[in-house]
Amino acid sequence: MITKTGTTIVGMKYKTGVILAADTRSTQGPVVSDKNCVKIHQITDKIMCCGAGTAADASRVARMASRELRLFQNKYLRLPLVSHFRKVCTQHLHKYGGGIGAALIVGGIDSEGCHLYEIHPHGSENSALFVSLGSGSLGAIATLESRYRAMDKDEAIDLACDAVKAGILNDLYSGSNIDVCVIDYSGVEFLRNYRRIGVSENTDTLVYPLDSVRIKREEVFDIVEEY
């Protein structure tokens, strides 16, 4: 069975950089196959992407585009632009007409500034201040639309986590933990399992006294040994 990421992924710009956030649940139909998978992929030193859809497709597209950008960097001795990654992905996906189940959120910083793009499986793309994709994107985008504003790093991380949490709580295919990636001019900071969602606060074990169960009837059977 094909493994899908289910997914709530979020991207947003803040004052000095870009935030990417994603849940960590992977599913096979109605079954949770992985509670702590990684949906944030590194492309270059300052370009990252989140993947939704079929897990293998999203991962392979990210690896393919990363390879193209690194070849460009080694050949021309220039740092690739975020738009270069966007172009490689959209052209590759468009050739297959939606046959590749990969939806991506791309964030990064280059010589032209901070960039955030959403890329859909058919090859369409869009630039945005904030975006959410995946099966839990409805709850996430509602949170972003109601609370997004000019923010510093800590406020942006909190909003991104709250958006993913809203997606998790309204979508059975999203869940477990929240990974966060912060991209700014100093580099990339990846915060693995930054927040856990749905963990029971009551960790006390239940203890039943031995006399808590009443014995209403007792029968004694003789053991018959047969040789």
From Swiss-Prot:
GO terms for biological process: proteolysis involved in protein catabolic process. It holds the Pfam family Proteasome. Its EC number is 3.4.25.1. Residues 1-6 form a propeptide. It is an enzyme of class 3 (hydrolase). GO terms for molecular function: threonine-type endopeptidase activity. InterPro entries: Ntn_hydrolases_N (IPR029055), Proteasome_bsu_CS (IPR016050), Proteasome_sua/b (IPR001353), Proteasome_suB-type (IPR023333). It comes from the Eukaryota. CDD domains: proteasome_beta_type_7 (cd03763). Its main location: cytoplasm. Keywords: Cytoplasm, Hydrolase, Nucleus, Protease, Proteasome, Threonine protease. It is found in: Cytoplasm; Nucleus. GO terms for cellular component: cytoplasm; nucleus; proteasome core complex, beta-subunit complex. It catalyses: Cleavage of peptide bonds with very broad specificity. The active site is at T7 (nucleophile). The proteasome degrades poly-ubiquitinated proteins in the cytoplasm and in the nucleus. It is essential for the regulated turnover of proteins and for the removal of misfolded proteins. The proteasome is a multicatalytic proteinase complex that is characterized by its ability to cleave peptides with Arg, Phe, Tyr, Leu, and Glu adjacent to the leaving group at neutral or slightly basic pH. It has an ATP-dependent proteolytic activity. Belongs to the peptidase T1B family. PANTHER family: METALLOPROTEASE TLDD, PROTEASOME SUBUNIT BETA TYPE-7. The 26S proteasome consists of a 20S proteasome core and two 19S regulatory subunits. The 20S proteasome core is composed of 28 subunits that are arranged in four stacked rings, resulting in a barrel-shaped structure. The two end rings are each formed by seven alpha subunits, and the two central rings are each formed by seven beta subunits. The catalytic chamber with the active sites is on the inside of the barrel. This is Probable proteasome subunit beta type-2. It comes from Encephalitozoon cuniculi (strain GB-M1). The gene is PUP1.
